[in-house]
Regions:
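Non-heme Fe(II) oxygenase catalytic core, chiefly the N-lobe of the double-stranded beta-helix
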Residues: 14-27, 31-39, 43, 50-53, ...
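Aromatic-enriched hydrophobic runs in primary sequence
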Residues: 6, 44, 65, 77, ...
């Protein structure tokens, strides 16, 4: 039976069960506007029903949003636009990469030495979005085929509510030219910008072997993090992804066996993996439940986890190429350039939890960096969350894959491994 009924407000009001689920309090960085999110930015954990961690409320809200049709209105507006640039409140956007690239070249938009001017893809939909993950039981329920069809269409439609905008990437290795005295290989760079660069000669020989990655690469990265952040007391690498469009082997993901699979696609959309809520929720569920933890088992009580999280902690993603990157580089945006910009929440609905990632609209002032021809020993680091909220340090960065217009047509696509971690102080 379809759930196209009611309103988001009523869905939320129906949730009366008092839950023992960890519920993060509302949190904002000093000077940061409220997010564009459901429930005024409160986590769906606040709407737990009999231990479901808010998953039913989030799924119902997804159907309400589809029925209200605002997302479809954005698609209709974009698809009815004439070819060429589309005037938006953020600037000129383009439906096609090639159109945006032609505009960049025609207007002589140039980057400094080592940099690159190119199209980057942003959302233009200023509403929260919902993604029902592939492991959710809804997809396998024969009684909910109509619901699954509607959700599948909505998921595809996320990409139809995006445009390409012109941006400039600067060479992150030359960071000191843009920020005198700030080395890209320093914790100070992470504190200020939310991005940095590290060196790693890994002894892992096969990054397609999940067990070897966990056994060899995870400890290497934990050691790297503790050396990079001298004030840190603990580092936990908890999962990883492998990206290789040209991989010919088995790509199958199996979370129960700690196998992430091999991604054929690259996330070509400006986003961040966490936010104010999920940065804390993800940490606590790792410490107390080992939920989707591919790394070292954790055995914290709730009280011990609360004590650990009462001190500073960060979520850091680290991306290491398997070979020199020729195409589909991984690019990073530095914190100060969007510190006063509201993020847009994307809810990822599992059977047992509601994750939150974030998307951003375009600004020409966004401060983008890349590592041209990034080598296999160069590890790009980006902050996904920082528990310090007083504005003294970066809270996060955001990132995307992109297409390098200067690469040869036969350049191989990026092959890399991305690990996710928490660092505690």
């Amino acid at each position: 039976m379809s759930r196209f009924k009611g309103s988001a407000d009523r869905v939320m009001a129906d949730s009366e069960t008092v839950s023992s689920t960890y519920v993060p309090s509302f949190e904002l960085t000093k000077g940061q506007p409220p997010p564009i999110a459901a429930n005024g930015g409160l986590s769906y954990m606040s709407f737990d029903r009999d231990g479901d961690a808010g998953t039913v409320a989030a799924t119902e809200a997804a159907f309400v949003q589809i029925a209200e049709g605002e997302g479809q209105a954005v698609i209709d507006m974009l698809e009815s636009a004439d070819p060429g640039p589309i005037e938006t409140k953020w600037g000129l956007g383009f439906k096609e990469y090639s159109e945006c690239l032609e505009y960049i070249r025609a207007n002589n938009i140039e980057a400094p030495e080592g940099g690159l001017a190119l199209p980057l893809r942003y959302t233009v939909h200023e509403q929260p979005s919902y993604s029902i993950v592939s492991s959710n039981a809804l997809w396998r329920d024969p009684d909910r085929e109509a619901d699954a069809k509607a959700l599948r269409k909505d998921e595809r439609d996320h990409g139809r509510r995006c445009l390409y905008f012109p941006q400039i990437l600067r060479d992150a290795r030359r960071m000191e030219e843009y920020h005198p005295g700030l080395s890209p290989n320093s914790p100070e760079c992470m504190d200020k910008l939310g991005v940095s660069l590290a060196h790693c000669d890994s002894k892992c020989e096969n990054f397609y072997d999940a067990a070897e990655v966990e056994r060899v690469f995870y400890p290497e990265i934990e050691k790297l993090l503790l050396e990079f952040f001298p004030d840190a007391t603990d580092a936990l690498v908890y999962n990883h992804d492998v990206f290789d469009k040209d991989y010919k082997g088995d790509r199958t993901e199996d979370q129960d066996k700690k196998i992430p699979g091999v991604n054929a696609g690259y996330a070509n959309l400006v986003h961040n993996d966490l936010n104010d809520n999920s940065g804390r929720v993800r940490c606590r569920e790792l410490l107390t439940k080992n939920l989707r933890n591919f790394g070292r088992e954790q055995h914290y009580t709730e009280e011990q986890a609360d004590a650990k999280m009462s001190r500073r902690f960060m979520s850091i993603n680290l991306a290491k190429p398997m070979e020199t990157v020729r195409q589909n580089p991984f690019v990073l945006c530095a914190w100060p350039s969007f510190a006063d910009q509201p993020y847009i929440t994307n809810y990822r609905v599992y059977d047992d939890r509601v994750g939150e990632t974030t998307r951003f609209t375009y600004r020409p002032e966004h401060d983008w960096y890349w590592f041209p021809q990034q080598k296999s020993t160069e590890v790009s680091m980006l902050k996904c969350y920082d528990s310090i909220t007083d504005g003294s340090v970066s809270r996060w960065s955001f990132h995307t894959a992109c297409v390098d217009p200067t690469a040869p047509d036969d350049a191989p696509c990026r092959k890399n491994v991305v690990v996710r971690s928490y660092v505690f102080f």
